[in-house]
């Protein structure tokens, strides 16, 4: 589903320089972009939003966005981003329910490289490739995946509260953990 905002600025831009400036201005407020979704008759769909992921990479030939629980690992071309003509920016939009939350990362393919997601028939190798992507530098909401890579987090207005998630400031204010080491070398967290 196309982003109404991105469609408008692409169509209104006089040249590539103006388009790049407008995109830079828009992403300064953070990404992904969240927009109202509408029904075909023009009335607002209060239960869904258009979520547009933007990623800047000047030399990439392709960019795959891996969105946890959304990207179809059997049909990865559906998650290939499109380059915005005349820019270094890539985009892909989805229409999602307002209670949606997901982590995501970007996997660029450079000139002459084979996309790391191609030809991997075994699920473990494919999943490792998808987990190795880059986080969203324009999104302050992050989570680390199972291999320790930071991924962006998108959460819409009605997403359930995650009481166990802490901000970096809250993490920094936690006391240092205390460990007990047994004679045989095992460690146990105290408290």
Regions found by a protein language model. Give the residues of each.
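A short loop-to-beta-strand scaffold at the N-terminal edge of the catalytic core in hydrolase folds
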Residues: 183-191
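Acidic/His metal-coordination segments adjacent to aromatic residues that form catalytic metal sites
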Residues: 106
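Aromatic-rich carbohydrate-binding modules that target alpha-glucans
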Residues: 45-47, 52-98, 109-182
């Amino acid at each position: 589903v196309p982003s109404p905002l991105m469609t408008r600025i692409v169509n209104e831009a006089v040249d590539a320089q103006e388009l790049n400036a407008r995109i830079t201005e828009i992403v300064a407020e953070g990404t992904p972009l969240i927009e109202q979704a509408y029904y075909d008759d023009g009335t607002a769909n209060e239960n869904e939003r258009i979520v547009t992921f933007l990623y800047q990479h000047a030399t990439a030939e392709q960019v795959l966005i891996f969105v946890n629980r959304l990207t179809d690992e059997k049909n990865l071309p559906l998650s290939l981003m499109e380059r915005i003509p005349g820019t270094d920016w890539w985009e892909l939009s989805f229409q999602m329910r307002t209670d949606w939350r997901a982590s995501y990362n970007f996997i660029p393919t450079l000139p002459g490289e084979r996309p790391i997601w191609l030809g991997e028939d075994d699920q473990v190798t494919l999943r490792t490739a998808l987990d190795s992507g880059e986080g969203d530098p324009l999104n302050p909401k992050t989570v680390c995946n199972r291999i320790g890579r930071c991924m962006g987090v998108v959460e819409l207005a009605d997403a359930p509260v995650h009481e166990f998630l802490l901000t970096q400031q809250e993490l920094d204010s936690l006391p240092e953990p205390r460990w007990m080491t047994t004679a045989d070398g095992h460690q146990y967290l105290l408290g």
